[in-house]
């Protein structure tokens, strides 16, 4: 089968998707440019700006290229399997040939260009999971659920071995959201998820804090379990399974925290619970970010006038903590504008997924890409504000970085392509069968 171009008559670029992308990219360049200004007001090394512009140009080429193509072919295993195998191979090569930077191996250097395969893996997980679950009309959905998990775990484990605990958790979370979307009976599944989440959280919080008051979480979980067990007979087996899984996950989380997580990873969790007791170590970064954000007040200090990054009080101000640097100079107004632009993209993605309810593959692909961006934004800003433990997740299209910039724009190109294909099929009055492009 050939990839067909969307007819020129119906080819459109949604300005409500494109404009926020362009504005966020511009904000990223402005924020990065500001970080190059020295204390005396002059520009320092601006090579990072040149690199980021190249990454953006490359990403926009992919965005427009895939916007113009009918990507229905991506549901074929002849396409998906090679993508999956190449991604796994890249993750293995990182552990063998990747340079060690700050005691981690997360990049491959090819022709002087650094590639971060874990960013590719996030998109591969979305594509693979959407493809597997699109067979749910032919096979048992729970069988497909676990097949998709088995395909995802090698990538998650390889990412964790770099080591990158936060990225491995993010990748697993993306898988779960896509797979969860692909299952039927969302009410039942949501209740089951709530039960597992509450009981597992109780195990983890008691382990970390030693405070047995968190057992109340498990009590609430058991109340929901009792309600669900008596709600419908068909739910009973799922409730029993949820309780078993909760105990297993809770026990595993305790073992994971106590015996598997590295000291710095445990430290991040403990610092998150009480960052003020660690202002000179792991909590220092978060507290400095909070100071930067708070000092920006309503309208900010103005371009190039931030003090936290200029005086090197704010670490990683071009990557992990660029939001704090931006908020210091552009204040609450600038921060809300940036969040609004991300919000428009996320809403567009979710609306598109609803419009593709008759095409499970497209719907799951849209949910996966949208949730990927939402999680990245939430985690990065949550780290900057101290809402969640410190991680190394950059802010898409804003933080400096080639892999995340290119893969984000590529993913957004897939959203635009699906919107074009969906509109074309809608105009034809056509309902797409899950397997139309498989055989």
Where is each model-derived feature located?
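A juxtamembrane structural motif centered on a specific transmembrane helix
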Residues: 1-3, 380-439
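Cytosolic juxtamembrane amphipathic/interface segments immediately preceding
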Residues: 1-11, 42
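Helix-boundary and loop/linker segments of multi-pass membrane transporters
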Residues: 9-11, 145, 311, 357-358
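Hydrophobic alpha-helical transmembrane segments of multi-pass inner membrane proteins, especially
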Residues: 20-23, 29-31, 39-281, 328-383, ...
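Hydrophobic alpha-helical transmembrane segments
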Residues: 134, 283-291, 295, 405-415
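Interfacial segments of multi-pass membrane proteins
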Residues: 169, 173-187, 308-330, 398-406
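TM-adjacent membrane-interface loops and short helices in multi-pass inner/ER membrane proteins
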Residues: 268-319, 330-334
């Amino acid at each position: 089968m050939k990839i067909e171009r969307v007819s020129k008559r119906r080819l459109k670029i949604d300005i409500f998707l494109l404009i926020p992308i362009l504005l966020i990219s511009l904000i990223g360049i402005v924020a990065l440019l500001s970080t190059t200004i020295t204390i005396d007001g002059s520009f320092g090394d601006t090579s990072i700006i040149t690199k980021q512009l190249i990454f953006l140009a490359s990403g926009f080429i992919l965005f427009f290229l895939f916007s113009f193509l009918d990507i229905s072919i991506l549901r074929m295993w002849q396409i998906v399997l090679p993508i999956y195998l190449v991604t796994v191979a890249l993750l293995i090569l990182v552990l063998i040939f990747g340079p060690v930077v700050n005691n981690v191996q997360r990049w491959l250097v090819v022709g002087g260009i650094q590639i971060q395969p874990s960013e590719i893996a996030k998109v591969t997980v979305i594509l693979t999971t959407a493809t597997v679950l699109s067979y749910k009309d032919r096979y048992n959905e729970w069988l497909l659920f676990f097949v998709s998990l088995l395909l995802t775990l090698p990538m998650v484990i390889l990412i964790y071995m770099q080591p990158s605990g936060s990225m491995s958790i993010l990748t697993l979370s993306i898988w779960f959201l896509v797979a969860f979307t692909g299952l039927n009976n969302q009410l039942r599944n949501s209740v089951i998820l709530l039960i597992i989440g509450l009981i597992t959280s109780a195990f983890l919080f008691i382990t970390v804090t030693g405070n047995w008051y968190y057992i109340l979480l498990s009590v609430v979980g058991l109340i929901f379990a009792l309600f669900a067990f008596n709600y419908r007979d068909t739910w009973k087996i799922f409730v029993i399974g949820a309780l078993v899984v909760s105990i297993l996950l809770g026990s595993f989380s305790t073992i994971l925290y106590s015996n598997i997580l590295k000291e710095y990873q445990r430290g991040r969790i403990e610092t998150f619970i009480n960052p003020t007791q660690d202002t000179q170590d792991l909590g220092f970064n978060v507290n400095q970010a909070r100071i930067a954000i708070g000092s920006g007040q309503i309208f900010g200090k103005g371009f190039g006038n931030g003090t936290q990054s200029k005086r090197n009080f704010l670490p990683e101000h071009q990557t992990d903590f660029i939001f704090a640097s931006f908020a210091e100079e552009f204040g609450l107004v600038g921060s809300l504008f940036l969040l609004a632009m991300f919000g428009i993209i996320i809403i567009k993605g979710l609306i598109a997924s609803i419009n593709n309810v008759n095409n499970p593959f497209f719907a799951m692909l849209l949910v996966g890409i949208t949730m990927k961006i939402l999680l990245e934004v939430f985690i990065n800003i949550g780290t900057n504000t101290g809402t969640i433990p410190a991680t190394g997740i950059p802010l898409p299209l804003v933080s400096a970085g080639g892999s995340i910039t290119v893969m984000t724009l590529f993913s957004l190109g897939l959203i635009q392509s699906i919107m074009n294909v969906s509109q074309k099929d809608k105009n034809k009055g056509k309902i797409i069968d899950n397997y139309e492009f498989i055989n």
